[in-house]
Amino acid sequence: MIYTAIDTFYLTDEQLQNSPSRKDGIDEATETTLRIYGCDLIQESGILLKLPQAVMATGQVLFHRFYCKKSFARFNVKRVAASCVWLASKLEESPRKARQVLIVFHRMECRRENLPIEHLDTFPKKYAELKMDLNRTERHLLKEMGFICHVEHPHKFISNYLAALETPPELRQESWNLANDSLRTTLCVRFKSEVVACGVVYAAARRFQVPLPENPPWWKAFDADKSGIDEVCRVLAHLYSLPKAKYIPVCKDGDSFTTSNKSWDSPSQPVPKEGIQINRSIIHLEIVNTMARLIQGTRIVTDIINILEIRFQGVPVYHFKF
């Protein structure tokens, strides 16, 4: 990723309690479930798109940041998750085409909702509307974050911390897994990456019963405090106590990823016939102009060939190497 600014997107507990979703009547449990559900979509889609883990991690952080400023009632969680994956893939220099992202999310929705898996046709107006919505949501993401998309993950600190603490090798993978799971929570918008890294190292050490230095306290060497580490462990424990997150319909703009209230196919928004005629006329005019240019170009090439054959006394032009 290209770092353009300092990572300063952090909120207090009071700000999270007064989130835009809460103001729209969405309770804390529903908001937590939708956050986990959206992060699950980002993680699963990243695997299907064969993206590196850094892309999924960045996408999940962008997802949490966006819903700290916007409500789940106004922006569909599935479409925002798709835009986060698309934007994160570009930020982490592993870009994917919009068509690939849309096809993957369409397939995931069919499998999760037990619907017949149908191929997403990329030619009808519905696909054009989906692609337009993907672009529109990406612009919303960038606008709400002031085009500052710098993300610092705890993963890069974990290896250094474990090496400094001289912990056993099995602790590394466990800490890495906990860091991935922490991205499903709001820890990334509450604490700096160093604190989250210390928290997951502490949780992994307790799980494997590995003692860590306490005199002096080991976390002070990494600019962390005990209260922050305890909160990270508490949030992770609460996450593991929750059932698998399922989609909860709260958005006013429709619940499906592939259908929208703004669809071109909606009878409430008919397409003017005059517009269709004008578009067809423009298309026909472009075709005629293109054919004319091709014919004119062919005539010019023929004239050049005739001149060359006359110049070189009837020797066929294809004998010469240009």
Language-model-detected regions and their locations in the chain:
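An acidic, Gly/Ser/Thr/Pro-rich helix-cap/linker signature
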Residues: 1-24
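C-terminal region detector
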Residues: 3, 10, 188, 203, ...
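A short, structure-level motif marking secondary-structure boundaries and short turns
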Residues: 26-28, 123, 237, 244
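Structured all-alpha helical bundle cores of eukaryotic regulatory proteins
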Residues: 29-198, 202-231
